Amino acid sequence: MKKRMLVIAAAVAATSMMMASPVMAEDFKVGICNYVDDASLNQIVDNIQSRLEEIGKEKGITFDVSYDNCNADASVMEQIISDFQADNVDLMVGVATPVAMRMQSATEGSDTPVVFSAVSDPVGSGLVDSLDAPGANITGTSDYLDTSSIMKLIQAQNPDVKKIGLLYDVGQDSSTTAIQEAKDYLDEQGIEYVERTGTTTDEVQLAADALIADGVDAVFTPTDNTIMTAELSIYEKFIDAGIPHYTGADSFALNGAFVGYCVDYANLGQKTADMIADILVDNADPAKTAVETFDNGTATVNTETCKELGLDFDTVKKAFEPLCTQVNEITTAESFDEVDAK
């Protein structure tokens, strides 16, 4: 279990009046658990922390943040949440659906609010009654994926596409809705599809090999953390086979996939921090605080992969632009710290 303790503090500016009658800054304990070590989720956590620091300075308060990453291990996740409870945190933050669901269960009947981040289907996963009115002591931010838009990107780049591979982890709640939406869309379009799944990196590698053998023209993966973790080990397989991999997060493109189409995860992290502050500082009721959703529309193209697939980036960009709010470029790396999207 990787554990990191961060104290985000802001000092209240001193005036002669305050020196005569000191004003004590409020202190809030926040426990953040990340589901897995991947670039998009790490970007969310980084932006939650930096935004809380800004809010602390603005309001003259202190956020004591405990951060852990369970690396998709359920027993480790359980221990992290138990530690947060033992530490009497004022609020828990669950990054990704599995963590949010466990936090919801662990805090049921208590006064500890939960804020989730990067949950693709908050209603379908049972976290909230509705996006507008969560109904319990939980709310958060969603990275809902507009699956049909990714399908349209595939068709824009290759109007003659005949068969699409669907690569995902059946155990990832974040993939369930998106995969069904992809099937429905492809059925309507009369495009053949084949499903391959994996729950570990080794299984994902075998699934990628199977899709290549299946002769697919392109591969689609939603915001699936299992596949994201394995991307660095499979992207070259798809390049060698001449198969573009379209995905539901820019971190996939960072790790070698052809395209990542998604929300702005940095902004999502900042908005999650705003929600944390609203609940702790301004006493907002999570049950009545609407889940915040974001416009999809940013396509991030890995220019190195694009070139190796024999595609011209300018041509791809021209095909994508009518379907996107923006088209970004990126090159292959392990983390966003190593490379800046253009």
Where are these regions (language model features)?
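Hydrophobic alpha-helical segments within soluble ligand-binding/sensing domains
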Residues: 121-163, 263-284
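Hinge/cleft segment of the Venus flytrap/periplasmic-binding protein
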Residues: 278-342
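Pocket-lining segment of extracytoplasmic ligand-binding domains
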Residues: 173-249
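Beta-alpha junction/loop-to-helix N-cap segments that form part of ligand/metal-binding clefts
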Residues: 66-129, 224-239, 243-248
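Sec/Tat signal peptide C-region and signal peptidase I cleavage site
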Residues: 19-25
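Short beta-strand elements in bilobed, periplasmic/extracellular small-molecule ligand-binding domains
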Residues: 54-77, 137-138, 185-201
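Extracytoplasmic "Venus flytrap"
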Residues: 29-49, 55, 66-75, 171-175, ...
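An alpha-beta-alpha
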Residues: 30-32, 48, 139-189, 289-306
